[in-house]
Amino acid sequence: MNINDPKQVQLCIDESQDCEAPFHQPGSPSGYHHFSSKKLKTCPNMIARILGDNPDIRMTTFESRCPVNTSKIALVVDPKEDYHFLRQDSNMLWSQKAGARPVKNVDAAGHTIWDPQLSYLNYSSEDSTLNYSIFCAYLCVPRIKKLYLLPGGGKA
């Protein structure tokens, strides 16, 4: 299986009872089942998974500042395919990293990301079918807390 091919990974998860995702997925450490291509990814489900795995994460707003030693991230979803995070950088602009690709500070239209909620995140015109059409939330995540994961997503 090519772990860099999301469709192969999802096929493995959907069709095999004992197939473990080769990378951490939100909800694995807190006991949620693997994602299924038969069920849409929703904001409430994704947020529950994230907060279940990381109780120190806090919901926030675009205007609010995160506490010291935390970073602000934004969660967006493509309900049929994927979820995605963007991070607010020290210059107050936003950056994103898709899988093994380099970090970018522009959206799918090549525009600087000032606010993820207003950004164009439809990548279906590239070599992908991803369209992060639903904005879910802004979150403050700890920067200094280390999280150790076991194979299969469990916490050490």
Q: Over which residues does each language-model region extend?
A:
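Cysteine-nucleophile protease catalytic domains, especially the papain-like/related folds used
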Residues: 1-57
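Extended terminal accessory/targeting regions
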Residues: 28, 89, 96, 151-155
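Residues in well-ordered beta-strands of folded domains
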Residues: 75, 95, 139
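Catalytic Cys-His active-site segments of thiol-dependent hydrolases/isopeptidases
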Residues: 83-109, 116
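Low-complexity, intrinsically disordered Gly/Pro/Thr-rich segments
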Residues: 110-128
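Noncatalytic regulatory segments and standalone regulatory/sensor domains
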Residues: 122-156
